Swiss-Prot record:
InterPro entries: Ub_conjugating_enzyme (IPR050113), UBQ-conjugat_E2_core (IPR000608), UBQ-conjugating_enzyme/RWD (IPR016135)
One Pfam family, short name: UQ_con
Principal location listed in the UniProt entry: cytoplasm
UniProt lineage: Eukaryota, Metazoa, Chordata, Craniata, Vertebrata
Membrane topology: Peripheral membrane protein
Compositional bias of kind Basic and acidic residues: 14-23, 253-265
Residue ranges annotated for the UBC core domain, each copy included: 74-222
SMART domains, sorted: UBCc
Keyword Membrane: yes
Function: Component of the FTS/Hook/FHIP complex (FHF complex). The FHF complex may function to promote vesicle trafficking and/or fusion via the homotypic vesicular protein sorting complex (the HOPS complex). Regulates apoptosis by enhancing phosphorylation and activation of AKT1. Increases release of TNFSF6 via the AKT1/GSK3B/NFATC1 signaling cascade. FHF complex promotes the distribution of AP-4 complex to the perinuclear area of the cell.
Family: Belongs to the ubiquitin-conjugating enzyme family. FTS subfamily.
Protein name: AKT-interacting protein
Residues recorded with modification Phosphoserine: S30
């Protein structure tokens, strides 16, 4: 029998007995009732123990915070955006081309037009970390070590970390590294040099420094037509002037440059009264046409 119902029945019985005794004048207090002990139902024999549901494993993430499976696409998009910025900046005398085999490697060349390194043509390679843009700053290595205080005389690597001690995402860009590589040839810095000899000569014997710079420029020019160190279809290479090939390309470039200028001149020409004859600088040289009346 259900204990709840049995307890209710006994209570009714006790209540009726008390009422009868009250009618006869005999008051009797009932003893204190004790609550029945609560028990959990027995566990069935074939029941399985209840366990806490396991939470799904966290999705693998790359170092830049994106899902690991999206990492290559995110990196490719970042590098494409960086190259677009380089093109828009139009850095004077600096040309770069991403590698065919790896987007993390760019080939480039710097043309120095004036200053101590005038007429210098320096080829280089930019190495971008595989966790870009969250890693260290890109490395820039010249194909031939240039005699410069900030260029390692053995490896040819430029001290880029001097300007980018900590690479900051969404703040630093590769075009800034290229601009820095160009600027070091116009503004010489000798503090904490990678080439101590070049730094000392620049500070104490500028003439000898200039002589060594000229020698370095000549070496780079003499080896300009050498095959690229890295075998890649997009590596930058130079060849001697060939009129049958280069003359036509030169004319096309000059023609494309003249057309915008001609269109601009036509657009700014305004028709109106003038007292100067075309081709003359003398005032009132234009003949007036009389109208017959």
């Amino acid at each position: 029998m259900n204990p709840f119902w049995s307890m209710s029945t006994s209570s009714v019985r006790k209540r009726s007995e008390g009422e009868e005794k009250t009618l006869t004048g005999d008051v009797k207090t009932s003893p204190p009732r004790t609550a029945p002990k609560k028990q959990l139902p027995s566990i069935p024999k074939n029941a399985l123990p209840i366990t806490k549901p396991t939470s799904p494993a966290p999705a693998a993430q790359s170092t830049n915070g994106t899902h690991a499976s999206y990492g290559p696409f995110y990196l490719e998009y970042s590098l494409l955006a960086e190259f677009t910025l380089v093109v828009k900046q139009k850095l004077p005398g600096v040309y770069v081309q991403p590698s065919y085999r790896s987007a993390l490697m760019w080939f480039g060349v710097i043309f120095i037009r004036h200053g101590l390194y005038q007429d210098g043509v320096f080829k280089f390679t930019v190495y971008i970390p595989d966790n870009y843009p969250d890693g260290d700053c890109p490395r820039l290595v010249f194909d031939i070590p240039v005699f410069h205080p900030l260029v390692d005389p053995t490896s040819g690597e430029l001290d880029v970390k001097r300007a980018f001690a900590k690479w900051r995402r969404n703040h630093n860009h590769i075009w800034q590294v290229l601009m820095y590589a160009r600027r070091v040839f116009y503004k010489i810095d000798t503090a904490s040099p990678l080439n101590p000899e070049a730094a000392v000569l620049y500070e104490k014997d500028i003439q000898l420094f200039k002589s060594k710079v000229v020698d370095s420029v000549q070496v780079c020019t003499a080896r300009l037509f050498d095959q690229p160190k890295i075998e890649d279809p997009y590596a930058i290479s130079f060849s001697p002037w060939n009129p049958s090939v280069h003359d036509e390309a030169r004319e096309k470039m000059l023609t494309q440059k003249k057309k915008p200028e001609e269109q601009h001149n036509k657009s700014v020409h305004v028709a109106g009264l003038s007292w100067v004859k075309p081709g003359s600088v003398q005032p009132f040289s234009k003949e007036e046409k009389t109208v017959a009346t």
